[in-house]
Amino acid sequence: MNTQPHHSSPDSPQDGGWFPISIRLSGARVLLVGGGEIAVNKGRLLLDHGARIDVLAEKLHPAVQGWVENGRVRHVGERADEAVLRRLLPGCRLVYAATDSRDTNRQVAALADELNIPVCAVDDPGPSSFITPAQVRRGMVRVAVSTGGAAPVLARRLREQIETLLPEGTGRLATYMQSRRAFVSGRYPNVQDRKRIWEDFLDGPGAEAARSGDESRADARLEVLLDGERKSGEVWLVGAGPGDPDLLTLKALHLMQNADSVLYDNLVSPALLDMVRRDAELVFVGKQRDRHALPQDEINREMVRRAQGGERVLRLKGGDPFIFGRGGEEIEALVEAGVAFRLVPGISAANGCAAYSGIPLTHRDCAQACLFVTGHAKADGVLDLPWDDMADRRQTVVIYMGISTLPQLAAGLLGKGLPADWPVAIVERGTQPRQRVFTGTLSTIAQQAAEAQVKSPALVIVGQVVRHRVVSP
């Protein structure tokens, strides 16, 4: 068993010149100068945060007009001249200059600044005393991203990336923790004790229960921590997908970034391991066909041992754990040991390799079914496969771990009556940068694979769908 630390390099601090704060707007007056598309975007944000908006504009966008008509916004005037602004500005918490005129926006900003009222001239940080960052919202949780007005498009792109990383239930988790703060404080008056309890709660299964809305389970986990019992561990059996890191599920990524230790094998790419929490212990268990760094029973014991010691153990598997990944055996071992676990499916090798090679697994004209089999031979070298089912011409056969037994596989299918020119494809290192695809027939594919020195991981696809392969120009 090989273990290695997972180090991180510190980021260099950068000063954008803007201090990020949060300001309470519920019930506060905000003057919005402008009634067009720009004003609509800012108005939606302000309304979401409970502001009382006064709009100063000659023409109103239909959305703004709708807000005025239903009483959510007041239309307080049309022209943004100095006299009107001096009458409207006092008492405002914030001012947005959101007209189509840069000169008008700067005039508004100058007057607001003179009265010491925070002002934002939209898309013009020069005269602004504050700017509105791109935001990600999960209930009461807010994440703001700002480039100091230097690159708004970049800020929005970063927001989109954060959206994918932040679990949807984060707002529920925050609400749960808020509702239990007084209870925890009553049990543990010491601030440091409370901090430790909440950190342990966030690191354990209670947080996931709260995210999913299961408050009774979350309460049970919190009570364990309040009683001072040892933090219990858990095993997360996670499918890492076929290789391309972009095919990882959000759930898988969330668990990867919260694990204490990671048990992984050959089918997990280095790019995926780079996405694991930086201080997690990486444990290579090296399962690859009949070569194992650890026997399966020992892998099972290692998962149990670590979880019983309080660790959050990530069992990271290529593809999907329940498709020729021995996930069922590992779950049975966890159940027998009484270890809590979670299952996260992954995009299977069959789905990923087929899509990236342009081969449909089903097709209305020639394949109404798809059969998954393993080409792994038994200890005596015999392939124990449903040959009659595999020879059905109305389906696609996807063969996992079939490269070493490819001559036997081809001969077996020919022996069951499939023609010599029956289409076959091999997808080597599917979905990864060095992917290779070979197409041939039952009579040629074994020789092609040998000449090209095809290595695992590779998937074999048999059927007429291979002739429907499409490649993007």
Swiss-Prot record:
Region (Uroporphyrinogen-III C-methyltransferase): 233-473
EC assignment: 2.1.1.107, 1.3.1.76, 4.99.1.4
Binding-site residues, NAD(+): E37, I38, E58, K59
Catalytic machinery residues: D265 (proton acceptor), K287 (proton donor)
Catalyzed reactions: uroporphyrinogen III + 2 S-adenosyl-L-methionine = precorrin-2 + 2 S-adenosyl-L-homocysteine + H(+); precorrin-2 + NAD(+) = sirohydrochlorin + NADH + 2 H(+); siroheme + 2 H(+) = sirohydrochlorin + Fe(2+)
Entry keyword set: Cobalamin biosynthesis, Lyase, Methyltransferase, Multifunctional enzyme, NAD, Oxidoreductase, Porphyrin biosynthesis, S-adenosyl-L-methionine, Transferase
Region feature Precorrin-2 dehydrogenase /sirohydrochlorin ferrochelatase, mapped onto this chain: 1-222
InterPro entries per UniProt: 4pyrrol_Mease, 4pyrrol_Methylase_sf, 4pyrrole_Mease_sub1, 4pyrrole_Mease_sub2, CobA/CysG_C, NAD(P)-bd_dom_sf, Siro_Cobalamin_biosynth, Sirohaem_synt_dimer_dom_sf
GO biological process: cobalamin biosynthetic process; methylation; siroheme biosynthetic process
Ligand binding (S-adenosyl-L-methionine): P242, G318, G319, D320, I323, S348, A349, M401, G430
Pfam family, one: Sirohm_synth_M
Molecular function terms, GO-annotated: NAD binding; precorrin-2 dehydrogenase activity; sirohydrochlorin ferrochelatase activity; uroporphyrin-III C-methyltransferase activity
Pathway assigned to this chain's UniProt record: Cofactor biosynthesis; adenosylcobalamin biosynthesis; precorrin-2 from uroporphyrinogen III: step 1/1; Cofactor biosynthesis; adenosylcobalamin biosynthesis; sirohydrochlorin from precorrin-2: step 1/1; Porphyrin-containing compound metabolism; siroheme biosynthesis; precorrin-2 from uroporphyrinogen III: step 1/1; Porphyrin-containing compound metabolism; siroheme biosynthesis; siroheme from sirohydrochlorin: step 1/1
Annotated function: Then it catalyzes the NAD-dependent ring dehydrogenation of precorrin-2 to yield sirohydrochlorin. Finally, it catalyzes the ferrochelation of sirohydrochlorin to yield siroheme.
Family indicated by similarity: In the N-terminal section; belongs to the precorrin-2 dehydrogenase / sirohydrochlorin ferrochelatase family. In the C-terminal section; belongs to the precorrin methyltransferase family.
Protein name as annotated: Siroheme synthase
Organism: Gluconobacter oxydans (strain 621H) (Gluconobacter suboxydans)
